[in-house]
Structures are given as C-alpha cells and as structure tokens.
Amino acid sequence: MDPGAGSDSSLTVNEQVIVMSGHETIRVLEVGVDAQLPAEEESKGLESVAAGGSQSGGPVEASGPAEAGSCDPDHSAEATVAARSPSESCPSDCHLQPSPEPASGITDPDAAGCTSCPPGQVAGQQGLAVWTIPTATVAALPGLTAASPTGGTFKPPLAGLQAAAVLNTALPTPVQAAPPIQASSPAQPRPPAQPQPLFQTQPLLQTTPAILPQPTAATVAAPTPKTVDATPQITVQPAGFAFSPGIISAASLGGQTQILGSLTTAPVITNTIPSMPGISSQILTNAQGQVIGALPWVVNSASVATPAPAQSLQVQAVTPQLLLNAQGQVIATLASSPLPQPVAVRKPNTPESPAKSEVQPIQPTQAVPQPAVILTSPTPALKPSAATPIPITCSETPTVSQLVSKPHTPSLDEDGINLEEIREFAKNFKIRRLSLGLTQTQVGQALTATEGPAYSQSAICRFEKLDITPKSAQKLKPVLEKWLMEAELRNQEGQQNLMEFVGGEPSKKRKRRTSFTPQAIEALNAYFEKNPLPTGQEITEIAKELNYDREVVRVWFCNRRQTLKNTSKLNVFQIP
C-alpha cells in the first residue's frame, strides 16, 4: 500500500525500523488509520509521543526537520521502533541511546522516549504499539538474526502487506502508546476542537488477568492540539496473536515456502471496516517474506454500522492460542471465547463525548468471558471450567429396599406392585423361619428340590434383606408364603415331620442354634466375672443349675473369652 495515500480513509502501513541491541529484546511499531481532517490543521503540526518499552523504555531519536528533546538516557539492552509518518523515510542515523535497565524490569514512566515528527506529515490517527521479543526467539526464526552488541538496523519486507507486527513472547508490563495527530486536508474549515487524549494498548500475555493503564510522564508532556468534533473514535485492544502450531514450527525450523504459501492469501478474518477498507488482519513475516502468523482484528459491527458525526470504531484483536519459547515448545496457552463468533465478544459501548479515544481495560465479567493465561507443560492443556455435577444414572432396576427407603415413594410402583406389603412379608418371614428353627440354607434346599434352582439359599437371603427387584420379590412372595404355611403345619404335628418336610439326612442336619434367656445370660456373666476359666466340674454344675447342656455352657465360656480377646480386654488369663 502506498504510504502516502492519506486522502482516503484507509489503513496505511508506516515504514518500520527495528533496532536490535545485544541479547535482550526488540520493539515494533503499530499501524495508522488515515482520516480527513479540517484544513487549518495543516498549519498546526502535532507531535507524536512514543511510549517506552515494557522493560526499560529506552528512547529512540529520529532526525528530521523538527526534533524534540530526548528524555533521560536509559541504558537498556533493548531496541525501540517508532511509528513513522507515511512520507517520512527511515534516516540512516537512527540509533539507540544506551540507557541503564531498571533492576525490577518494570517500565519507568519518567524514562519514556520522546520523538517528534515534522508537521503536515501524518493524517488521521496513528497508534503506536510496542512489543518485545527475546533475542533467543528472534534467532530461532528464519531470516531474523540478532544484531551485534553495538546495535544494528534491519527492515522486514512490507511489499503487498497492509499491516505488520512481530510476535511478542515476553510482556511483563503493559506497553504504552501515543497516537500522533497531524493535519492533512487543506480544503475544510476548522471548527472548535477538544484535546485528543493519548491511548494505550494493553497486551494480555501476562500472568495478571487485567491491568488498568496508567498515564505516563510522556503522556502529560505531550502538546495538546486543537481537537476536531468529527474525529472518529477508535478503541484498539490488541489481545495478542493467533498462531497455528504448524506455522510456528515451520517458521522456527526454517520451513519451505510451499508450506506457508497457502497462508499468504487467506486472512484469518475477512470482515472489514466499511469506512476503512483493507483492515482485515495484520500479517507477520520474516526477512525472506514468509508468512509466520497473522493478527486479525475483530470489529464490532454494531457500532460501525451506526453513521454519526462521531463514529465509534471498536477494534479488538484475537487472543493467542499458543505461546512458544525459543525452542518451539509450548509454554503457555490462552483460553478465550471461540474465534468464529467475534462480534459477540464485546457489547457496543456508548461514547461519552463525540471525540474521545478511550482505553478500555479488559476485565473479567460474568457475561463476557475474558482470556486468561494458563502455564502448561509442552502439551497444551485446557482450562477447566466450572460445571454443575451431572447425576449418574444407572440402568439397573432399583431394589425394594431402595424404593421403600425413599420418603416420597408411593406404595405402588409402575407395575402395580405393593412395595410396603412385600417389605412387611419379608420381615415376618424371617421371624417365622427362625421360630421354626430353620436356616436360610434349609429353606433354600427345600424350595430348590420342589420349585427349582431359582429359589436357592441366596435368593432367600436377598429376599429377606430386600436386596431384590420388585418383580422378583413379587414372584418369590407367593411361593415362600405357601411353603412357610405348610412348614408351620408340619411343625405343629411334630419336629420330626418338619425335618422330613424340609428334607436332608439327619446326620447332615445342622445343629440347632442355642438361644439363652436373659436370666441365663445374666447368671453366666456373673460366673464369668468370678472365674473366666472354670474347670470341667464347675461347668457341669453351672449347666445343671441353669438347665442347659454342659457342652452349650462350655462353648459359651469359650466364646465369651474370645470376645474379650478380640476387644483387648482379656490379658491376664492363662489357658492351661
């Protein structure tokens, strides 16, 4: 694009100068927007103030027709690039003022570099954005080599490009920029104007989520020009760079042009600003002209489509997806809103005054999720998002106990089964079975012999615990009820008849469990307190007194001693 095309409202690419010094970092320019201003502004040159870098703010002096006094020297191992006017070429004497670097690495507002441009050179507004790149990262890109410690100058190719920038991988503090405003249209009258405040661009590749911009000494020292009522309002928020891992790896490893050739003609976002054609993306190239990345602009079309004397253009840069180190390893990833919906990222803001350049700090809100840097391993990790717990559904049918235990469960389920009736029957069945002296195994064996294997001992056990589905319980209930009634009738006729009904040989029949009355338990505990290890004669006397079998009493004493051993209360007894 012709740098001097200032008559139309379009984006112009200013000539770029990158001064590298030593082993630290470099800084890069930003783009400018041409707009028609009233005629009297041609005679009123405005000085452009370039804010210092993010680490030291070393000044750069540009020799020209008009030159402002440079600020205090700051010995820095960085290089600063100033945005230049379209008609001004880079003089050969652009040099770096060595300046001391602060120990803390934070930008000193008083050390901001001050440059001046000749009057009548730049039309409209120009934004100066400064980015820093470690020299190690520059050395990894093909064609971008670090200069000698004494300083060097090189220009990246700008042929056919509408805007250019350089990747920033180290931004510890916000970088400040000042737009120079100069007159270019001599054909229009000049109405009364207001001061045009300088704005600052705030990069987001920092560990802090949002930092409010602070005014610097350079901003205060800038001369206040006469403002124009119809000056367009521009809010620029460069949030970073969007890179593809394949592009980065190809560029850092010296990739061929055929790998990157398809990327030169396809911008990331094709939406353009109606009043300023050509603003679609900023393309990043190396010294050989190979495309290594693109910085697309997201335009809020709601505010652009409203024609007004003070049109408000809000431009927001796409946030980066990956952050690489000098070796090409991913050291950070940026979680943000999806790229295909750029218009919905920010809501249009009502301008407070007709002519005002705002700095809108990005702050996280509930409605608009803002990006946040997540330090990761070489493999990019996704930022976890807060989600409501998802209930885990099970395909298994709930058991009767689960259904009955629910407080608001109706007594009838979807199949018309009375769950409360089944619960009461299971409880009564266990009591009646124990009263007959029968075990679950005996009942299971008897039912298996007559009804089949579905009525085994495990089925009886699950039924009594209600660990069974309602349908299975409904199937077991009538069979168990019928069998239990017949067993009680046999028991009334005699124990022998019951055993014959239950089945099984007497020799293999399990011995009936002995149950002690409360009085017998109290007497046995009294004897146990006197003598935990009674002799055989004493056991016989206790059994006769309580009217129990001698073997039953002996086993009770054994079990009682074992219980104390298990509870660690018996430690003085010695069994002979």
Swiss-Prot record:
Domain called POU-specific: residue spans: 414-488
Cysteine-cysteine disulfides: none
InterPro entries assigned to the protein according to its UniProt record, in alphabetical order: HD, Homeodomain-like_sf, Lambda_DNA-bd_dom_sf, POU, POU_dom, POU_domain_TF
Transcription regulation among keywords: yes
Domain of life: Eukaryota
SUPFAM superfamilies in the record: Homeodomain-like (SSF46689), lambda repressor-like DNA-binding domains (SSF47413)
Region feature Disordered, mapped onto this chain: 65-88
Residue ranges of the annotated DNA-binding region, renumbered to this chain: 509-568
Cross-referenced SMART domains: HOX, POU
Tissue specificity note: Isoform C1 and isoform C2 are found in the brain, while isoform C7 is found in the testis.
Keywords: DNA-binding, Homeobox, Nucleus, Transcription, Transcription regulation
GO CC aspect terms: nucleus
Gene3D superfamilies, per the entry: Homeodomain-like, lambda repressor-like DNA-binding domains
Keyword Transcription found: yes
Molecular function terms from GO: DNA binding; DNA-binding transcription factor activity; sequence-specific DNA binding
Subcellular location: Nucleus
Function: Transcription factor that binds preferentially to a variant of the octamer motif (5'-ATGATAAT-3').
Family: Belongs to the POU transcription factor family. Class-6 subfamily.
Name of the featured protein: POU domain, class 6, transcription factor 1
Protein source organism: Mus musculus (Mouse)
